[in-house]
Amino acid sequence: MIAREGSNSRKVFIKTYGCQMNVYDSVRMSDALAKDGYVQTEDMGEADLVLLNTCHIREKAAEKVYSALGRLRDMKKSREEQGREFMIGVAGCVAQAEGEEILRRAPAVDVVIGPQTYHRLPDALKRVRRGERVIETEYAVEDKFEHLPVAEKATLRSRGVTAFLTVQEGCDKFCTFCVVPYTRGSEVSRPVRQIVDEAMKLVDAGVREITLLGQNVNAWQGEGPKGEKWGLAELLYRLAEIPGLARLRYTTSHPRDMDDRLIGAHRDLRILMPYLHLPVQSGSDRILKAMNRRHTGEEYIQLIEKIRSARPDIAMSGDFIVGFPGETDRDFEDTMAMVETVKYAQAFSFKYSTRPGTPGADLTDQVAEDVKAERLERLQALLLRQQKEFAESLVGKTMDVLLEKPGRMPEQLIGRSPWLQSVNLDAKTLKIGDIVNVRITATGPNSLFAEVAGS
């Protein structure tokens, strides 16, 4: 048995790639390992266990993981020469998608564990210490959330005043470009009781804002106290009743699951922030059909208008893919026209990346890389202009800002606007966790500047 130095506590370093759900999963893995004697560290050099929580959405993300594993191999060799324990684990969607291939390409890896089996991680590490190389990537019959512990109050409090809370996993939409149904599985909703209990623990520990997470979060379904069917709207109304919870958000949504009840929740609940991430991917009906999005561009625009009618102060965010197989200049111009029509406060855009195992990978009319790059540059310039215009429209206006963390300057705090922007504020008498009414005085490249209203 390889020895450990120092204290009785083992140390784990977790590197998180990709989406907010991976951030949430990393936190829950850390909590599970804490029950097994692990303390999380931000210094990889002092870790006994390194976990890479991976993303498989784009090809470059997966290759980053293999590059990191190459560096970890050398670290492991050095540790073993010193007689010290050092284990390497790959978690997340690359683990789910590639499984045995990871062990083949990176022999230094000890454990490969998919997103549905994180609750088995402590047991997997025990098996590694017995000499096994472990793969846990099957979809578990048991509910992982029932088995993943929530951290103690003191630990939760140390994590800040905002928190993610996963309520739904997986996706049944099978968009032709996307690996999520293959790496996260079909749509599964957490029970109301689990969600409310976790939310109450977070609020009790000082959390003021909770963001509900799901690959397709507005497909969440549950059962109310009288056995009635609940959707995300009913869950939001229930969470809004928790004393001390000041703000709610949710992401990511699919246009087809944006029903009237959910739109009504945006109208009724001031606790629900006026910001909605609603990906569309393309403005071309032909490409939307090829992507299996199951809605048209016009239907998406009409949905946006309906949402804005219910909540006039709402700001929209979205996702776009350029260069999907078969995308013509006309198709791309349809996307540009949609962006001009919707006017996004923020949006994310990417070149299409072929993902093995998806229907899009089998299409032959791939778009040339230089064409993708040119289109992406044009789209991002338009989106950046809209983002700046939205930020500038807030100058001189007042809003409530949740103070989250210290700023770079003395006596400066950084808060979050209702529309998810960072807000820099001189706050001598204020503290983290306060919600303060401010007046926006200026914009920066990626943030706003403000003063306390009335000062």
Curated annotation (Swiss-Prot):
It catalyses: N(6)-dimethylallyladenosine(37) in tRNA + (sulfur carrier)-SH + AH2 + 2 S-adenosyl-L-methionine = 2-methylsulfanyl-N(6)-dimethylallyladenosine(37) in tRNA + (sulfur carrier)-H + 5'-deoxyadenosine + L-methionine + A + S-adenosyl-L-homocysteine + 2 H(+). It holds the Pfam family UPF0004. Residues 10-130 form the MTTase N-terminal domain. Its cofactor is [4Fe-4S] cluster. InterPro entries: Elp3/MiaA/NifB-like_rSAM, Methylthiotransferase, Methylthiotransferase_CS, Methylthiotransferase_N, Methylthiotransferase_N_sf, MiaB_methiolase, rSAM, rSAM_horseshoe. It is found in: Cytoplasm. [4Fe-4S] cluster 2 binds at C171, C175, C178. [4Fe-4S] cluster 1 binds at C19, C55, C93. It comes from the Bacteria. CDD domains: Radical_SAM. Binds 2 [4Fe-4S] clusters. One cluster is coordinated with 3 cysteines and an exchangeable S-adenosyl-L-methionine. Keywords: 4Fe-4S, Cytoplasm, Iron, Iron-sulfur, Metal-binding, S-adenosyl-L-methionine, Transferase, tRNA processing. Its EC number is 2.8.4.3. Residues 392-454 form the TRAM domain. The keyword Kinase does not apply. GO terms for molecular function: 4 iron, 4 sulfur cluster binding; metal ion binding; N6-isopentenyladenosine methylthiotransferase activity. Residues 157-389 form the Radical SAM core domain. GO terms for cellular component: cytosol. Catalyzes the methylthiolation of N6-(dimethylallyl)adenosine (i(6)A), leading to the formation of 2-methylthio-N6-(dimethylallyl)adenosine (ms(2)i(6)A) at position 37 in tRNAs that read codons beginning with uridine. Belongs to the methylthiotransferase family. MiaB subfamily. Monomer. This is tRNA-2-methylthio-N(6)-dimethylallyladenosine synthase. The lineage of its organism: Bacteria, Pseudomonadati, Pseudomonadota, Alphaproteobacteria, Hyphomicrobiales.
